[in-house]
From Swiss-Prot:
The keyword Signal applies. GO terms for molecular function: toxin activity. Coiled coil: none annotated. Residues 1-20 form the signal peptide. Belongs to the neurotoxin 19 (CSTX) family. 01 subfamily. This is U3-lycotoxin-Ls1b. Disulfide bonds join 48-63, 55-72, 62-87, 74-85. It is found in: Secreted. The presence of a 'disulfide through disulfide knot' structurally defines this protein as a knottin. The keyword Secreted applies. The lineage of its organism: Eukaryota, Metazoa, Ecdysozoa, Arthropoda, Chelicerata. It holds the Pfam family Toxin_35. Keywords: Disulfide bond, Knottin, Secreted, Signal, Toxin.
């Protein structure tokens, strides 16, 4: 009976070790595929339009800020008939970024205090 128990433990150990190695191989393959996809995406990415620059030709080309993508906002200037479009950050997103930044700084202070 002891022999069967010892053999069973050895079998389970070998099985778990081999499955762990297989999972590591799969994870490495997934990482390699993901990196190649990211490189392809970066290669085909076009230049973004900075904040407050004209985005009338491509309204989806605005750059990202720290957390959110800027939005192409169009308006008619006072006394003008031509529509003007610029990349801008909506105020509510601006306030959310400020709050997130302050929370991050406060979290760093708490971490520093309590080590």
């Amino acid at each position: 009976m002891k022999f069967v128990l010892l053999f069973g433990v050895l079998l389970v150990t070998l099985f778990s070790y081999s499955s762990a190695e297989m999972l590591d191989d799969f994870d490495q393959a997934d990482e390699d595929e993901l990196l190649s996809l990211i490189e392809k995406e970066e290669a085909r990415a076009k230049e973004c339009t900075p904040r407050f620059y004209d985005c009338s030709r491509d309204r989806h080309s605005c750059c990202r800020s720290e957390l959110f993508k800027d939005v192409c906002t169009c308006f008619y200037p006072e006394g003008g008939d031509n529509e003007v479009c610029t990349c801008q950050q909506p105020k509510h997103l601006k306030y959310m970024e400020k709050a997130a930044d302050k929370a991050k700084k406060f979290g760093g202070k708490i971490k520093k205090w309590f080590g």
